[in-house]
Amino acid sequence: MERAATHFLRLHKSGISALCSGVIDPDYGITSPVLFSGDIDGEVTIWNLITRRPIFTSKICNEQVVDIQFLEGKYLSLLCKDHKLRLYELLKLGAIVKQSDFGGGDKVDLKQIFEVPVNTLNFANYVLTYLGNNKFELVTCHTQDAHFIDIYEFETPELNSLKRFSKAIDFLPMLRDRFGDNLLPKMDGLGIIMKFYKVNEVVYCGFESGYVIAFRRYRNKPLYRKRVSGFIGKPINECASGISKLLQHENVETSSSVNDLELDNVIEIVLVDRAHYPDPVLDMAPNPKKNGIICSSTTNKLVLTSVDEQYLAGPNSAYIFKSDEYLLDKKNCLLMSTNLKIDGSAVKDMMCKNIGFVLSLGDYIITGNWSGKTYIGRIESDKAVLAAAKSRSLIEVNESPVGNIQQDKSIQKSSKHTKIGAMTGFEVKDKEPDKLMCKNKELTPGKLRRLNAFVQSKWYFIGYTDGTIGLYRAE
């Protein structure tokens, strides 16, 4: 049964292209959950989700906002189509807040603290992680080729602190060495990167080929290789990568227990999943049941995949790996267990094709397709129902003084629903509702009641191409 939105937020004059929700650090004086929205003209707005009023709006750039991330309750990062990733910090309490308890007078402002060029000539987003002490890690597409990955670190507010630790990471050579012709029988390569998503310490990459590859980075944790006689798996020719070539002429007596190589900033591949092969991965969301992800494609299927626990643990507690148990590329930066297999994950039918958006809230899965319809189901159920579809006006406005007696066929074929530009959700987990309420003890009973009613529900927010944002309850 289709569900009506509880409210619509209206301020943007162009289509919504990015959404993100969160809770601002209480030191900043904002006493409610917030929603960040960006549109195709570069306008960014921060909404108070209880009053449903904007507390900040500004034109960040003249291009589309591609993706928004909110970290640590005070850092806002924006990726825009002008090929720049901007990082902002909320200003201190005394400088930004006009205390009105809970009303529309609460205001925030943003201060830009970092900017870095990023390749946006593709579909992919990025992953930004706060490392502590004003340091950040950035995972994004390679500057010149969206088939590859770059990993950076930087420290704010030092603009010259940007350092690239991994350049143009290419998974394909190692995967071909390991899996041969079984990897991509119908395609020449993995294709461009379509989506990044990070769960705990693991970064998932969805590719144009439909493959999902997950990796973890050993940051500031040196790995040591223990050389073992023999070579890994089948013999690898001279054109291939991997440490097998290094081991073909080893002396058994002298190599059995020698830690001969120390590696820094190693990337370990921990999952290879066919997922949607050969259809492209369109979106990803966390899978709370398996500590993995849910990914969508142009078909009506969702794929639920996760990393096996044995690979989450790493080589061992001493960070020593045996040469006959792991493949190592020729640059000594990529590592993969020889026991790793191509996964075939659980598949879920969501009753609609072209699932451009997927979201998980507890055990709910919400999907949005290209035609503007939203479906909702549960992770462990085969049923999904139509949840939302915002009707658009069927009356086309023609500003020309000259009429047209012939009906435009393109109007007849266009969708009767407003298309979706972005989706996000909000839920307060476990004991967080009580924690959030404790932080707001000074609110009046009525305002506390409104806040409590909001945080007890699971919410999803849909940004439409007409500039409106719908607020929906998942229950």
Curated annotation (Swiss-Prot):
Component of the ASTRA complex involved in chromatin remodeling. InterPro entries: WD40/YVTN_repeat-like_dom_sf, WD40_repeat_dom_sf. Disulfide bonds: none annotated. Keywords: Chromatin regulator, Nucleus, Repeat, WD repeat. It comes from the Eukaryota. Component of the ASTRA chromatin remodeling machinery complex. One of its GO terms (cellular component) is nucleus. Belongs to the WD repeat ASA1 family. WD repeats lie at residues 11-57, 60-98, 443-475. Gene3D superfamilies: YVTN repeat-like/Quinoprotein amine dehydrogenase (2.130.10.10). It comes from Candida glabrata (strain ATCC 2001 / BCRC 20586 / JCM 3761 / NBRC 0622 / NRRL Y-65 / CBS 138) (Yeast). Its main location: nucleus. It is found in: Nucleus. GO terms for biological process: chromatin organization. This is ASTRA-associated protein 1.
